[in-house]
Amino acid sequence: MEVLEGLYYSKDHEWVKVEGDKVYIGITDYAQHSLGNIVYVELPEVGSELSAGDVLGVVESVKAASDVYTPVDIKVLEVNNSLVEDPSLINNDPYGSWMVIAELKDKSQLDKLMKADEYRKFLEEE
């Protein structure tokens, strides 16, 4: 499984990329691999304010449906409608296929997430 440096990871297998006050959120390579071929993606409304642990969206595959959670408090600025039109983009490039771009409400919440080396260890225990 690919784990990229420079991202933050949640125990629910979401990744967070920080750029200034904005974050990009998606699901990890492990998550997409576990789900299999993704056939449907549901995203939140632009303007939604979500707290850490809230459902950000839904990803469905031929095997299962899975909620995607926001690992940090956010206000959704943009959604990636390309994923709605072609959900398989997540399978092909999970780290390039962000689900939302959002305003990060509390940067200190990033400290509760894992960095790449911690996430790799976490995956070994899964």
Curated annotation (Swiss-Prot):
The keyword Transmembrane helix does not apply. Pfam families: GCV_H. Binds 1 lipoyl cofactor covalently. Residues 22-103 form the Lipoyl-binding domain. The modification N6-lipoyllysine is found at residue 63. Keywords: Lipoyl. Its cofactor is (R)-lipoate. GO terms for cellular component: cytoplasm; glycine cleavage complex. One of its GO terms (biological process) is glycine decarboxylation via glycine cleavage system. InterPro entries: Biotin_lipoyl, GCV_H, GCV_H/Fam206, GCV_H_sub, Single_hybrid_motif. Belongs to the GcvH family. The glycine cleavage system catalyzes the degradation of glycine. The H protein shuttles the methylamine group of glycine from the P protein to the T protein. PANTHER family: GLYCINE CLEAVAGE SYSTEM H PROTEIN (PTHR11715), GLYCINE CLEAVAGE SYSTEM H PROTEIN-RELATED (PTHR11715:SF3). The glycine cleavage system is composed of four proteins: P, T, L and H. This is Glycine cleavage system H protein 2. It comes from Caldanaerobacter subterraneus subsp. tengcongensis (strain DSM 15242 / JCM 11007 / NBRC 100824 / MB4). The lineage of its organism: Bacteria, Bacillati, Bacillota, Clostridia, Thermoanaerobacterales. The gene is gcvH2.
